[in-house]
Curated annotation (Swiss-Prot):
InterPro entries: Ankyrin-BTB/POZ_domain, Ankyrin_rpt, Ankyrin_rpt-contain_sf, BTB/POZ_dom, Histone-fold, Histone_H2A, SKP1/BTB/POZ_sf. It is a single-pass membrane protein. The gene is abtb3a. Coiled coil: none annotated. The chain crosses the membrane at residues 160-180. This is Ankyrin repeat- and BTB/POZ domain-containing protein 3-A.
Length: 1021
């Protein structure tokens, strides 16, 4: 083995504490290595190089043969179905619908979705829901440290659960969605979160699902955006890989999927198969056949080819490449020295690749990823899980044990080394550390191995302690002493405070750890009331802040910046500690200073999000301002006080009692404060003209109105309709989006009284606020309610809405078809036996005509004349047409137009049928125009049915406009209600089958688009 002798001579400290690469850095000549496929190995579409279980793998002659080593015990493959714990099946409790899944797949134009059946979509949804559960479980564990789930927890969970390649794609999609969301501040309350993010999946549904699943006490809206974008991207990733499978048949160029082909494609994909299994542990790096393979992102073959063309890099031999591959794919080791060498080699090649695909949310930390190294205890812990006692038998000085007390883990459940590194390093990066410790490895083992569990990592001062060799001896000694001081304070013994302070360094009691936290902050996290009091008595700064700069404190967690001891006490819900800090005159707003922007949540925001009524009441009593929001660090904010204030956070999480408590807070100068009703009644411009002495009052009223509008938006998005109705009852106006989301929630929850109240409130929405959402989401929802509900009140209210949306403009008129007559005869020849060459038999009476005219009149006449018998005197019998009606048809043809026709009202419908039968378009249109002028409330249903029977779509469309314009009156008529609610059936006539409600929806959509959404505003009607 290359470099084996040299590695054996190095100490474990050298292998772990130097550059992070151990002996691998000088074992090879360059870090730019391609992992190319050997000709003897099969190449898989989604896995790079694959290693099969062959007889040669039984060899024990080399430690690198630990790749896919097959032990005798492995012949009995683990029956996971009976021994391994399984994930909970979500079934219907997923935050997406099958329609949204199909829409997400069709969003990618390169995907040929075709007509994917509901069976395929349901199977795909069930499989991907397991990935959702895995990501949510990991995010839930990490959220315990700071009692909230942000985008950082979701991102780290994605990196832990998904493979190298898929996680990069999903995080890229999440970053893109969040960027779009942050930039869409102009009309944000009038558009849904998903629309603002460019997503198909509902961000509001994902947020509600995360709250209901208790992923964390507090869910940041960016976390929901990340998770929804990730899952949408994952659906497309899975579908793309299935499409590429050779097992997918094609029908006329369109892929033809089946459940079997879907499962087979996933079984052959080493990056998907384990992810989508139902077991709690995550099977990584191998497919259903047990074949180990490298993911696409670890294959540098193309990069090396490009480097070779430019003269950069170095081409490695097949032996060197095989060594690298075996290092990454090793599943068992025989000793700690062997593991140290394998980890060093793997880190040497994984970290440059990781820098090429950055996905960490903190750029400063990402730039230093190359310095991540493994602590000695981390390697010992990893060796415990990967150790194979049989591999020690190669040593002649070691005699095999005669009695076995332990059962080896079967190969099927052993992950390759690259997966251990991937998960452990993801944990390290999440806590912003530069060294992998033993707890990171234990967390990885809990995820990757069956039957292994450990407690979630707690927030401690030594989380990110690192004695790197880049520090001199004196600095390192000071760090160790400071760490000892933090440990002494964290043990909870108040009698050690003075001794600990002497060890903390020049800043004394206010010294900060690598995480930027003081001893007082850690005591507040633990809820140690006695220690908090001792530290305050010792002079601890009660308003100290976590620094924003990462220069001196590189492991500061992004969402704790500017956090104070009060912030951490509120985060973890320690009411006595909060009371103690407030009594000691801690700033109730945290780190906020007057006239400065707030880049972190205030204690009241955190308490409101968690729904802690006791804490909210306490903070309000001490003067906390519920109107203060958060300004994001990108500088984008729609309001001067920031976003997601306490009202919004309580509403977003569904804490109705907390929201009402915030509303009931009495302003200090109640007599001078404008009420919301006054603000809404007078309007912003009128209020601004008030006396200058009311400027502060004006700002307060405006800020509260803006805060409640924002809260209304979030409560509607997340399905907390009761809170939305509470806000509406205060006089806050609807937007079309919040009204539609509330109506959708009430319909899903079958809350009929609320539906009636919402429908009644539609008239409050101004017509100039109508958007495309009314057509794409509103109309389908309202017609679905009309179809499902036979309630007369709801039907009447919907009729009012449809009539209002149709507008006051007249129904678009039907126009005559100006068709030039190809041939024409004098009316004298009409039904004239002289010179007649064709005779029609109508109701037993002859009707004489001329072929020269009829042959070019229409295709129907041409067919009748062409198919007549050869005998000259044979009559053409016309059935189903009355003699007087046929005479009108012939009069139209001989006169060359409709001007000379005198049609009675009793004849118009029969003439319309005859014109349709003889395919005389101009005559048909003339009849339709006459019908449209004679439509009444009593006759409209019968005329509509006849028009649909004949397939006279123009007339049917006109009558649909009549229905919508007069629906308030028509909905009271029994025959109209029967028309609406009858089950669509195949039409017995020449016209196609129809669904009245669907056709009314389409007609109304066209109308709204023409008069409300077009620039002409009704000029086309």
């Amino acid at each position: 083995m290359a470099g084996k002798g040299k590695t054996a001579a190095r100490t474990l400290e050298d292998l772990t504490l130097d550059s992070g690469y151990g002996g691998a850095a000088d074992s090879f000549r360059s870090s730019s290595v391609s992992l190319c496929c050997s000709d003897t190995h099969l190449s898989y579409a989604h896995g790079g190089n694959c290693w099969h279980l062959t007889e040669s793998m039984h060899s024990r002659h080399n430690s690198l043969d630990t790749v896919n080593t097959v032990l005798a015990e492995d012949t009995e493959i683990l029956e996971c179905s009976g021994q391994c714990a399984k994930l909970p099946e979500l079934e219907e409790d997923v935050p997406w619908s099958l329609g949204e899944v199909e829409g997400a797949l069709r969003k990618d134009e390169e995907l040929c979705v075709g007509n994917a059946s509901r069976e395929i979509l349901a199977k795909l949804s069930a499989l991907v829901s397991r990935a959702l559960v895995r990501i949510a479980r990991e995010a839930q564990r990490m959220s315990l440290r700071y009692a909230r789930c942000t985008k950082h927890e979701i991102q780290s969970a994605i990196k832990m659960v998904l493979s190298w390649t898929i996680s990069v794609n999903c995080i890229t999609a999440a970053l893109s969605a969040l960027s779009l969301y942050n930039m869409s501040t102009g009309d944000k309350f009038s558009r849904g979160k998903s629309t603002r993010c460019g997503l198909i999946f509902s961000v509001g549904k994902f947020f509600r699902w995360m709250v209901d699943s208790r992923v964390a006490l507090r869910i940041h809206e960016h976390a929901a955006i990340y998770l929804s974008a990730c899952m949408e991207s994952l659906f497309r990733e899975v579908f793309t890989r299935v499409q590429r499978s050779a097992l997918v048949e094609k029908e006329n160029g369109v892929p033809k999927f089946s459940v079997e082909s879907l499962e087979q494609a996933i079984n052959n994909d080493s990056e998907l198969w384990g992810l989508l299994q139902p077991y709690q542990h995550l099977i990584c790096g191998k497919n259903a056949s047990g074949v180990l393979s490298l993911p696409d992102s670890l294959n540098l073959h193309r990069d090396q080819q490009r480097a070779g063309k430019t003269g950069e890099g170095h081409a490695y031999s097949q032996a060197e490449l095989r060594t690298i591959e075996q290092s990454l794919l090793a599943t068992r080791v025989g000793s700690i020295a062997e593991l140290s060498d394998l980890v060093s080699r793997a880190m040497h090649h994984l970290q440059p690749l990781h820098i090429k695909n950055p996905s960490n949310g903190t750029p400063v930390h990402q730039n230093r990823t190359g310095s991540v190294h493994w602590e000695p205890e981390a390697l010992y812990t990893l060796c415990y899980f990967m150790h194979c006692p049989q591999m020690e038998w190669e040593n002649p000085n070691v005699e095999p044990s005669k009695i076995t007390l332990h059962t080896e883990r079967p190969f099927l459940v052993l992950p390759p080394l690259m997966e251990w590194i991937r998960v452990a390093v993801a944990h390290t990066e999440h806590r912003r550390s530069f060294s992998v410790d033993s707890d990171d490895v234990r967390q990885a083992a809990r995820l990757l191995l069956p039957g292994v569990d450990c407690e979630p990592r707690q927030l401690k001062a030594d989380d990110c302690f690192c004695a790197t060799r880049k520090l001199d001896a004196a600095s390192t000694e000071a760090k160790f002493l400071q760490d000892l001081g933090f440990r002494m304070l964290n043990c909870g013994r108040t009698d050690l405070v003075k001794q600990a302070v002497n060890l903390l360094g020049p800043d004394g009691i206010n010294s900060m750890s690598e995480q930027g936290m003081t001893p007082l902050m850690y005591s507040c996290v633990r809820g140690d009331e006695a220690m908090v009091q001792m530290l305050l008595d010792a002079g601890a700064d009660i308003n100290s802040e976590v620094p924003s700069s990462l220069h001196k404190h590189p492991s500061v967690y992004p969402d704790t910046r500017q956090g104070t001891p009060l912030t951490f006490a509120v985060l973890h819900g320690h009411v006595p500690v909060v009371q103690l800090l407030l009594d000691a005159r801690a700033n109730v707003e945290g780190a906020i200073q007057e006239s400065t922007e707030n880049y972190t949540e205030t204690p009241l925001q955190l308490a409101s999000a968690a729904g802690n009524f006791e804490l909210v009441s306490l903070l309000l009593e001490r003067g906390a301002d519920p109107l203060i929001g958060t300004t994001y660090r990108n500088g984008i904010s729609s309001g001067p006080l920031g976003e997601m204030n306490s009202y919004s956070l309580a509403a977003a999480h569904g804490h109705r009692n907390v929201f009402r408590k915030l509303l009931s807070q009495v302003e200090k100068d109640k007599g001078d404060v404008l009420s919301l009703e006054e603000m809404l009644a007078e309007g912003s411009e009128a209020v601004e003209r008030r006396a200058p002495q009311n400027e502060g009052t004006l700002r307060t009223g405006k800020a509260k109105l803006r805060a409640l509008r924002e809260a209304m938006y979030h409560s509607a998005e997340h399905g907390h309709v009761d809170i939305t109705i509470d806000i509406r009852s205060l006089g806050v106006p609807w937007t079309l989006h919040t009204w539609l989301e509330s109506l959708r929630t009430c319909f899903v929850q079958q809350r009929r009284p609320l539906i009636q109240g919402l429908l009644k409130d539609f008239s409050c929405i101004k017509e100039d606020e109508y958007t495309e959402e009314l057509i794409t989401h509103g109309l389908p929802l309202m017609f679905q309610i009309l179809r499902a509900s036979k309630n007369e009140v709801i039907s009447q209210q919907l009729s009012v809405i449809f009539t209002q949306c149709y507008g006051p403009f007249p129904i678009p008129k039907l126009t005559e078809i100006k068709k030039k007559q190809t041939s024409r005869l004098d009316p004298h020849f009409l039904n004239n036996k002289e010179m007649s060459d064709v005779t029609f038999l109508v109701e037993g009476k002859p009707f004489y005509a001329h072929k020269v005219l009829l042959f070019t009149a229409s295709p129907r006449f041409k067919s009748l004349l062409s198919n007549r018998p050869a005998a000259e005197n044979t009559c053409i019998e016309i059935s189903h047409v009355k003699y007087n009606i046929f005479q009108l048809v012939m009069q139209y043809l001989y006169c060359g137009g409709t001007e000379s026709l005198h049609i009675r009202n009793t004849e118009i419908m029969e003439l319309l049928s005859a014109a349709k039968f003889f395919q005389l378009d101009a005559l048909q249109r003339h009849c339709e125009i006459i019908c449209s002028k004679n439509i009444t409330n009593d006759s409209c249903v019968d005329i509509y049915k006849h028009a649909r029977f004949l397939g006279a779509l123009e007339l049917a469309g006109f009558i649909e406009g009549f229905f919508l314009k007069n629906m308030v009156l028509l909905i009271e008529l029994e025959n109209f209600k029967q028309l609406l609610y009858e089950v669509p059936a195949d039409s017995p006539g020449p016209g196609p089958s129809y669904d009245v409600l669907h056709d009314l929806e389409q007609t109304l959509a066209l109308r709204i688009r023409s008069i409300h959404l077009s620039t002409s505003k009704g000029s086309i009607v």
